[in-house]
Amino acid sequence: MSTNNNKAPTSQSSDKSATTESKLNDNENTETETKTDENNEEKPKMTLKPPQPKIENKVSTIDRVVPSVKYPKSLPLPHDVLFNEDKTINLPKLQEHFFAEGRLNHDDVIEIVKMAAEILEKEPTLIQVEAPITVCGDTHGQFYDLIKIFENDIGGNPANTNYLFLGDYVDRGYFSMEVIIYLYACKINYPNTFFLLRGNHECRHLTEYFTFKEECLHKYSEEVYDFITESFNALPLAALMNGKFLCIHGGLSPDIKTLDDIANIDRFKEPPSSGPMCDLLWSDPMEEFSPEIREHFVPNDVRGCSYLYSYRAVCSFLQKNKLLSVIRAHEAQNAGYKMHLQNDATGFPSVITLFSAPNYLDAYNNKGAVLRYENNVMNIRQFTCSPHPYWLPNFMDVFTWSMPFVSEKVAEMLLVLLNLCNDEEAEKNENAQTVKDTSEEEKRRQMLRAKVKSVSKMMRMFSLLRQERETIMMIKSFSPSRKIPQGLLTEGKDALKKALGDFAQARKMDLINEKRPPILDRVNSRGELLRMNSRGELFRINSKGDLFRSNSYADLKPPQGPQETIKITECHEQNITTNNINPNSITTNENNSNEQLQQQQQQQQQQQPPTTTSTTTQTEVAK
């Protein structure tokens, strides 16, 4: 009987527990918990959960809002993945890592720079390169366009293609570190087929003034910057391609008469502001490139240093050194290349300019181009820009970027307060109709109206700053003072868009940045302050304040060259054909008329149509 009495309550308790659990399961905001008492009977305990609000269209804070944009690599590439067992670089892994905005270990970057510099130091100042080869112009920190060059239908894979780069790998673009490290890695892997020349931006002076140093400090450290700028001193200055073409970054110099003059330059130093080394990096062909210009060299006012060289200067140099042409970079071109007036003695373009940074600064809307020289045929292959990750201008953080948004809201609140005061003043005047305005009250109302107008104008400017932030930052990058031109904001959105219209306008705005930046005050070994005035004259100031002229820079007076007359010929930018050229005598068959050249152009276009990824221009060179 006692047993039955004990079982009955247990059964009833179990039934109650089951009923309670059933009810609790119907309620999402409750939880059940079992608790054992002294008689080993389980009693349910109910815990209430706070009500959960129903949110539609939830946005995860873990997943990307734009799924197509992948996360940047958060960890550096491991050392054993970056380096192969034979101490070469794993280029596919490095490219993949850089493509995902990844970075390297600090020590690995320094090791790559040291290895590349050791190879470059052993090369002569004037290197010899042979065809087949791909020649590239400026890349300026555009890593994603650099990788496009290495595609098979443009420049070719560096593993089985000879390459010659003409300098300007850093500054202006936001991926200069990736460009220089990847090029150095290619040099380490292919030291005998991958060649790098020095450009005017490969120096401490310009990288401090433009973006490269800031990028190094943002991504790595000042120690990395010091190692890289030191490695720039090891880059050769010129290359002789197949014994026929002089390849340099900038151009000719009045101090350079022969190829030996280039080979004898001491390049292991920071480029000076004058002299043959400076001219190889900074000089440009004249805008009016014709035989009518009798001077050979004139000061280069656009660059603020070096010279502009004429058609006569180039032809004289080519004839004396038995060359066909000068291949250079240094200047942005809308088509990615420019074939200057052809040499009357050879029928070949006297100067060829290459520029391999498409849509330069994300503003020029230009094409990039490389020159492929193979089997005595030159193919100029054009290509367009590749999409790349977005960086805020000058590596700006989001708080600085958001200041126009905050300022606009503050201006709106201030305007509301001032308008409120103005409305109260008007209401007060309506109630006091019989009282005439005194001069002080009228003056106060005018001041209040002026404040409202000023704040309204300021609010419109902040609104424009917010809406056109990217355009304004691009205009700032073109300005040497890094400021918006005065009055441009008040002209509105259309004026900003017009300021960044086409290639010609962008280049005109950016022209000031093509000038050699002023030398900052420095202290020499004697503790004297070195300072340059606006005319480019260098002075030193001692501890007493005495001023002395420094003789560190040579006079820029242009030399007078020979005054021979040369027949004017027209340069055809496509399908220039020369027959029976002997490099020793530099003679040519001049029987080809313009009509024949046009017919040859049509025939070659039919034989080799351009691909969808590049535009091909062919130039044949006789053996």
From Swiss-Prot:
* Major enzyme class: hydrolase
Ranges in a coiled coil: 422-460
Top-level taxonomic group:
Eukaryota
Q: Which residues form the active site?
A: H201
Which reaction(s) are listed as its catalytic activity?
O-phospho-L-seryl-[protein] + H2O = L-seryl-[protein] + phosphate; O-phospho-L-threonyl-[protein] + H2O = L-threonyl-[protein] + phosphate
Question: Region (Disordered): which ranges?
Answer: 1-53, 577-623
Return the GO cellular component terms, semicolon-separated. Answer: calcineurin complex; cytoplasm
Cofactor notes:
Binds 1 Fe(3+) ion per subunit. Binds 1 zinc ion per subunit.
- Region entry Autoinhibitory segment, spans: 459-466
What GO terms describe the biological role, i.e. biological process, of this protein? calcineurin-mediated signaling; regulation of sorocarp development; response to cation stress; response to differentiation-inducing factor 1; sorocarp spore cell differentiation; sorocarp stalk cell differentiation
Chain segments carrying region Catalytic: 104-389
According to the UniProt entry, which residue ranges have a biased composition of type Polar residues?
1-22
Please give the family membership noted in the entry.
Belongs to the PPP phosphatase family. PP-2B subfamily.
Q: Which residues bind Fe cation?
A: D138, H140, D168
Protein's name according to its UniProt entry:
Serine/threonine-protein phosphatase 2B catalytic subunit
CDD domains cross-referenced by the UniProt entry: MPP_PP2B
Annotated EC: 3.1.3.16
Fill in the subunit field for this protein: Forms a complex composed of a catalytic and calmodulin-dependent subunit, calcineurin A, and a regulatory Ca(2+)-binding subunit, calcineurin B. In response to an increase in Ca(2+) intracellular levels, forms a complex composed of canA/calcineurin A, cnbA/calcineurin B and calA/calmodulin. Interacts (via calcineurin B binding domain) with regulatory subunit cnbA/calcineurin B. Interacts (via calmodulin-binding domain) with calmodulin; the interaction depends on calmodulin binding to Ca(2+).
Explain the regulation of its activity: Activated by Ca(2+)-bound calmodulin following an increase in intracellular Ca(2+). At low Ca(2+) concentrations, the catalytic subunit (also known as calcineurin A) is inactive and is bound to the regulatory subunit (also known as calcineurin B) in which only two high-affinity binding sites are occupied by Ca(2+).
